[in-house]
Amino acid sequence: MNWQKEAINDLRQYYARKQSLENMAERKLALEEKFKAIKCAMSDSTPVMGGASRIEDNMLNNIVERQKIDLNTEATSRLVKITERGLSGLSDQQRLVLEKFYMDARMNHVEYLMDALGYEKTRIYEIKDRALYSFTISMFGIIDY
């Protein structure tokens, strides 16, 4: 496994994962409201010949979807916390370089970093490589075997 690629992937997905935590919470609230509406309609239907009603199917689907959201939220939250811990072990300069290269990559990010940090292009890439190595070690432990 290429641990450095995994670390880069974690950095690139950090902001999207963090945003998804808010979105999943909102989605769960919407499903809970929908579940209340389904329960209200439950008294109106009677299954035919012992089969399940469409409303019961909708209730079960709603429950399963909420459970999936809970599990996804837990997993995503852990990944966000792990990434934040990995970033917290870096210097401000290293964090800024990784952010501009991977997390918030925009046009001319190298030039921006050259101006912001006062270094030449080769030095920016050296800082990026060292920061990425340190981040990868903090995320995955020993990677050089």
Q: What are these language model-derived features?
A:
Residues 105-123:
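Helix-turn-helix DNA-binding module
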